[in-house]
Amino acid sequence: MARSAGFLLSITSLPSPYGIGTIGKEARKFADFLKKSGQTIWQILPVGPTSYGDSPYQSFSTYAGNPYLIDLDTLCEEGLLTKEEVMSRDWGSDDAEVDYEKIYNNRFEVLKIAYDNFKKGDQKAFTSFKRKNSSWLKNYALYMAVKKSFDMVSWTEWPDEEIKMRDEAAVKRYERKLKDDVDFWKFVQFKFYEQWESFRAYVNGLGIKILGDMPIYVAMDSADTWANPELFQLYDDGDPIAVAGCPPDYFSATGQLWGNPLYDWDYLEATDYEWWFERIKAASKLYDITRIDHFRAFASYYSIPYPAENAINGEWVEGPRIKFFNMMEEALGKIDIVAEDLGTLTPDVTELMEQTGYPGMKVLEFAFDSGEENDYLPHKYTENCVVYTGTHDNDTVMGWLETAKPEDVNYARSYCQMPDDEPFNWGLIRVAYESKADTAIVPMQDILGLGKEARMNIPSTLGGNWVWRLDGAALTDELADKLKTMSEKSGRLED
């Protein structure tokens, strides 16, 4: 595998006059900056529609795209919106942070205007899109329309028992009753995928690959669980039997209770993992490389009986292991996958990583707190891995510098052989690029030397996450030249 490098930046973090980044011209500008910097990978966060808490890892659908990412300027150019209709809205006043409440209150109203105008024109491409994507689109659009009619509560709380349990007659009744709204949600997906195709073609045309992110679990509040309850460990009334999380560890005495429903792997195996393979196939239409979050759950997953207040009483249960990936390769051919294998790795996870041959992840921020034996130190790497300075779940490098123990910071400086005049973030970036890892990825916050105010997410907290936005003025030619030189010196520049 050729040595390569790239940046991690959520699309939501791009500059935009409409409060949140989109797949419009600023996304193309950022791709141009990657090219100028000698990078060949743009890693992004999941792009599904987000729910309460705004986490891209809790989505209403594993297939649908986030309506927030649709570029409104493009809709104006198509005559579906006027500039005035877009600019008269309050998208938030802070260019450094996304105001999700304001986005939520305005974005769908504006998209509804676009939809009403769209209905007057040619529907041919839309009809074709609906037909090609009906396997997931019908369920998703109806789910969102019914959800909206019930004040956006999850399907497990819908007051109409018949539609909650997907009674056939009730499904038909709601499809008729909410027809226009159902079609609106289909239109939104049509525009997302139309724009995504154009965005991806532009990025790929520059020789840059999109490294996308797939959460392993689906949200309880999703079209997936509502439409396919048999795939999950659910009771007949829709309540989960057990939910996902992580056991207590050094960082948390009570563990992490994520609350996602767990897969019924016996059922999935009996159906030749068809749902999963369709999901992975759909991801490869969006991305060139797919990172699978919490990969270890394919070896064994943590099961917490429902309901629970914390993760203390869970147990490890065997996952589908290598059989799943062998069958996947038979069904889909070779798919480029990065396995998120962070945390404590048990022998079954190590074995699965070796069997699949997927590159795992190494994070430099984890490397300097336990001396020479730490597996995240670069001299321990093999070529077949992706090295990061940090991820969306960690503090920025400069934020880490402020809070780390002095002895850990001193060890990092000494190990990385940082001269006194080298800024700490650049020392870590240099070491990542010079490491033997095939791929090096750096979050934009670390390239810009930003502190904890630019951290993307603090796990197990609600509010104030996923809001950081990039200042476009920071992407200078001087910075691009510096990064390109670093790529060249470390053998990561494409010929």
Question: Each predicted region: which residue ranges?
Answer:
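Mature N-terminal, pre-catalytic/accessory segment of carbohydrate-active enzymes
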Residues: 1-25, 29-32, 36-37
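Alpha-amylase-like alpha-glycosidases and glucanotransferases acting on alpha-linked glucans and related
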Residues: 2, 10, 16, 54-193, ...
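Short alpha-helical segments and helix-capping/turn motifs at coil-helix boundaries
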Residues: 25-32, 194-202, 277-278, 424-428
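Catalytic domains of carbohydrate-active enzymes, especially glycoside hydrolases
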Residues: 26-50, 286-287
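Surface-exposed amphipathic alpha-helices with a cationic face
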Residues: 35, 196-204, 329, 353-354
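Outer-envelope exported proteins of Gram-negative bacteria
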Residues: 45, 209-211, 215, 289, ...
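Conserved, well-ordered alpha-helix/loop/beta-strand core segments that scaffold catalytic motifs
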Residues: 185-218
